[in-house]
């Protein structure tokens, strides 16, 4: 999990842990399970990368019928978002095949977002964009459905522009 500070990486990790039965779904987003150090819990930020292995079952469906179930193991690394701990992100990225890029829908692409996207690009990681904190569009910004849709499109365009810049620089 990579992204800017306070975009919800640790809370998202909690949700994945809850889906695996490691913590209760009610505690997800509050317990910050991956922030196991006392100073991380006190400050409310991740300072060291933490890893956990999760298992997921995926049903194979062929022509509407379940053909079987595949088991997958996902090694999840929750990384810090603060610039002071960017070496933790670099180290974690070198251990991974892919990355979930967590972006707060209201904050959008921030400086550390660009940095972690660049790190993922340089390390050849397959990235998946996770748009987080969707409730803020309604509770804080009070957007209509059409305005929220437009905001999401803008965010995706921002991310694509950043990655497109990396591609253009690599081609020169």
Each predicted region: which residue ranges?
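P-loop NTPase switch module centered on the Walker A-proximal segment
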Residues: 1-102, 141-144, 150, 154-163
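Detector for methionine-enriched segments
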Residues: 30-34, 47, 122, 134, ...
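Conserved C-terminal guanine-recognition region of P-loop GTPase G domains, centered on the G4
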Residues: 93, 98-171
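Short helix-terminating capping/connector loops at secondary-structure junctions
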Residues: 68-69, 170-172
């Amino acid at each position: 999990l990579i992204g800017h500070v306070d975009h919800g990486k640790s809370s998202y990790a909690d949700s994945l842990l809850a889906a695996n039965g490691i913590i209760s779904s009610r505690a997800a987003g509050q317990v910050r399970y991956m922030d196991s150090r006392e100073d991380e819990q006190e400050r409310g930020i991740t300072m060291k990368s933490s890893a956990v292995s999760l298992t997921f079952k995926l049903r194979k469906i062929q022509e509407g019928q379940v053909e079987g179930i595949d088991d997958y193991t996902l090694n999840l690394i929750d990384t810090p978002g603060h610039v002071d701990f960017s070496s933790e992100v670099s180290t974690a990225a070198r251990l991974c095949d892919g990355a979930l890029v967590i972006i707060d829908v209201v904050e959008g692409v921030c400086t550390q977002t660009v940095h972690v996207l660049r790190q993922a690009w340089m390390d050849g990681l397959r990235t998946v964009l996770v748009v987080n904190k969707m409730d803020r569009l309604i509770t804080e910004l009070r957007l209509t459905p059409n305005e929220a849709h437009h905001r999401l499109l803008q965010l995706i365009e921002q991310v694509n522009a950043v990655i497109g810049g990396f591609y253009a620089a690599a081609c020169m």
